């Protein structure tokens, strides 16, 4: 009985962490800034997905370095959080499978 209790506690903690990661992803700015060279001139666009399709919003010929850094950091953080979220989902699936059995442990 004690092992199942520990597994239930771990499952509850994992579900809470999953919600926290989802909120963290939602707080990040969506998309990424892309520099396109068109006829020898550089233009910046914000690229993101909406309803499964890529959307491109013109941001100007130049973008502030702080904005470039913000989107670069957000992209790195988004990748890190998504990796963690993927591992957490696998852990939750495993814990639910371990708790599914009817026999006493």
Kindly give the residue locations of the regions a language model identified.
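Conserved glycine(s) in the ABC-transporter nucleotide-binding domain "signature"
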Residues: 1-105
């Amino acid at each position: 009985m004690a092992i199942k209790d520990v597994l239930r506690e771990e499952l509850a903690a994992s579900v809470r962490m999953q919600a926290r990661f989802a909120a963290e992803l939602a707080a990040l700015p969506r998309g990424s800034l892309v520099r396109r060279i068109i006829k020898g001139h550089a233009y910046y666009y914000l690229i993101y997905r909406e309803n499964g399709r890529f959307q491109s919003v013109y941001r100007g010929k130049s973008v502030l370095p702080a904005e470039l850094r913000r989107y670069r950091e957000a992209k790195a953080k988004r990748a890190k959080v998504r990796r963690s979220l993927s591992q957490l989902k696998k852990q939750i699936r495993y814990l639910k499978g371990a708790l599914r059995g009817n026999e006493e442990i």
